[in-house]
Amino acid sequence: MAEEPDEKRGVSMKEPRKNPFFLIIVCMMLMMLSQTVVSFAIVLLNGGSLFQSGMTMEQADAMMLDIMFAHQTEILLISGVITIAGLWLMAKVRKSTFGAFTGITKPTKVPVLVLALAAGVAMSFWATIAINAIPWPEAMVESYVESSSALTTGKPVIDFLAVVLMVPLVEELLFRGVIYDALCMIVPAGAAVIFQAMLFGSTHSTMLWMLYSGLIGCVLGYVRKRSNSLWPCILMHSAFNGSSYLFNWFSEHYGEDSSTVTFVFIASAFVLLLSLYGISFRTTPKE
């Protein structure tokens, strides 16, 4: 039997949570504070020369940023573990289980998972080509490229664990899990999809990243709403992030071939739409 969408199941009504606004704020603070604390610890461990006399404030700031940039995926990996531990503690405080609190134990069907993987790969290629095709202001593009390049640190195992596994898991637990459910206590499920996407986009470091992350958050929120499960969202997000490495290879070999790029752009849009339609079809309640 197909999964029933949230608005028909009435999940938020059957599993009420107290103070949804407070819960959303705590979740956002948990993620930001964990990253801040880990970043500070990394700087302390790797920035011994910061304490040398004669260094100006500007030089110290630049060195701190360089250290955080070089260890970005380590920061994401460690702070992700802390965030998950924080969610586990929040569940205990609310006298719930981790699975029930985050929604990760809600099952889904294998075809939906396969479609989510396909959608993640297609969305990665389509979104990246679309971003490159739009004439954004140069400063906006430079800040985006600088921030995104920090996710490739020359430590492939750590980069993979952080970008492809930890980040999708943590962000889905937070935004399509706890925060989405909390929003459903306040607004209809469709509006909750939009609001969680806005919050998701706001956590990214540059304006261009915020814009496209917000749009991706809408798609992930739609999948969450339709499937009533986090697993399609986690797999889709993981495939999206992992495909960025595949796109780098594609861009290196075919980036100058406009006909190939155009074909991949159209094909990825078709696969994305077809996959989302398949997810919608597979999660429509049968008469």
Language-model segment annotations:
Residues 1-101, 110, 242-287:
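N-terminal, membrane-interfacial amphipathic/helix-forming hydrophobic leader that caps
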Residues 21-26, 77, 110-118, 157, ...:
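Hydrophobic alpha-helical transmembrane segments
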Residues 30, 34, 78, 82, ...:
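Hydrophobic alpha-helical transmembrane segments of multipass integral membrane proteins
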Residues 32, 36, 40, 121, ...:
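Transmembrane alpha-helix boundary/anchor motif
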Residues 32-40, 197, 201-202, 208-266:
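Functionally important transmembrane alpha-helices
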Residues 51-57, 64-69, 98-167, 181, ...:
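Juxtamembrane helix-loop-helix connectors linking adjacent transmembrane helices
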Residues 79-83, 159-163, 212-217, 268-272:
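Hydrophobic core segments of transmembrane alpha-helices in multi-pass, intramembrane catalytic enzymes
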Residues 170-195, 222-229:
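Membrane-interface helix/loop boundary segments of multi-pass membrane proteins
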